[in-house]
Amino acid sequence: MSAQVILQPSRDKSLRRKHPWVFESAVAELKGRARIGDTVDVFDDEGDWLGRGAYSPHSKIRVRMWTFKKDESIDNGFFLRRLETALALRKRLFDPNKTNAFRWIASESDGLPGVTIDLYDNVAVVQLLSAGGEKHRDKIVWAITKLMPDVHVYERSDVDVRKKEGLEPVTGVLHGQPPTQVTVKENGINIVVDIESGHKTGFYLDQRDSRAAAAHYAKDADVLNCFSYTGTFSCYALSGGAKSVTNVDVSQPALDLAKHHVAINGFDDKRTQYLNKDVFKALREYHEQNKQFDMVILDPPKFVDNKASLNRAARGYKDINMYGIHAVKSGGLLLTFSCSGLMPADLFQKVVADAALDAGRTIKIIARLNQASDHPIIGSYPEGYYLKGLVCEVTDD
């Protein structure tokens, strides 16, 4: 029999709305014994059953809910159903002849809290951020290979958030013989994904729709791609007819791969430049030189790690956007992003607006961009919305 988590009075409302988290402060009592990752049943203070989830004694999120169906066991069949349902949705989203890389499981939004699975052609990269995911690793791999027998599976559970669950970093082969790198297609663009050491699980799949937007706006433009990483925004801009693209990144290996991406997609390397420099420093130098571009892309790393750092992060976003706005020709476009889940969309918009004021310029928002469609947001879990983007016309008016 599973251990039981009893909630404090009046702390059942979020679970009744099917929010997948139970916080430590909501727990009144643990009846029975539960080790890290064990399945527990959750009850309100009057004894009504609310759901079933994974117990994490070291985390402020004490239980991550697997199911709200009383007759649903957390077994092989459970994980198979979750993966099968998620895969069916992804197959509706993409033309496999043009795109063969996507997020298969988006953790809470696909009913598997703390579990991420990204598919890169025939390689599935698994990231387990929760005690429950760790506990059921073998079941998850079994379900992957049941649905895709020819797939190779690699684990990239190497992020700091695992420490909050009392877990150590884990990487390595889980099934088959995955290569170190795999070349995939995204909207017809060839992209090399570094499975073992690339950012996240190897690539920023969540920016697919934003990259397509960049292609749409790039015709005949001189484009500045800041925090360019491996240059996929640049490849999309070139595919959309950009006159030139300048990539700025602090990582020379990333810029080398960006140059390779230009080559394997058949673009003219004479239309590209590569600047190995801190983006803040580069933008300040462009401002001092009065150098401007038709389109500037700002896709910085996450600035907000916790709520306490939000104000500091807002100042960072304001500074980078002010210099980014300086770098846009009058009538040109700024594509700016925040991938910080703790940065509210309205605050991000205010930060960009304040940056424009400080730059002495006017912005007009012409489009909003979000995480790609394979990163869905389930209605009961608004925290799943994390990537915000704005397309702004910049003028001197």
Curated annotation (Swiss-Prot):
Signal peptide annotation: none
GO MF terms held by the record: RNA binding; rRNA (cytosine) methyltransferase activity
Keyword entries, A-Z: Cytoplasm, Methyltransferase, RNA-binding, rRNA processing, S-adenosyl-L-methionine, Transferase
Chief place of localization: cytoplasm
Subcellular location: Cytoplasm
Enzyme class: transferase
Catalytic activity: cytidine(1962) in 23S rRNA + S-adenosyl-L-methionine = 5-methylcytidine(1962) in 23S rRNA + S-adenosyl-L-homocysteine + H(+)
Keyword Transferase: yes
EC number: 2.1.1.191
Keyword presence, Metal-binding: no
PUA domain residues: 2-81
Domain of life: Bacteria
Cellular component GO terms, alphabetical: cytoplasm
CDD domains documented for this protein: AdoMet_MTases, PUA_RlmI, RlmI_M_like
Family: Belongs to the methyltransferase superfamily. RlmI family.
Reported function: Specifically methylates the cytosine at position 1962 (m5C1962) of 23S rRNA.
Protein's name in the database: Ribosomal RNA large subunit methyltransferase I
Gene this protein is translated from: rlmI
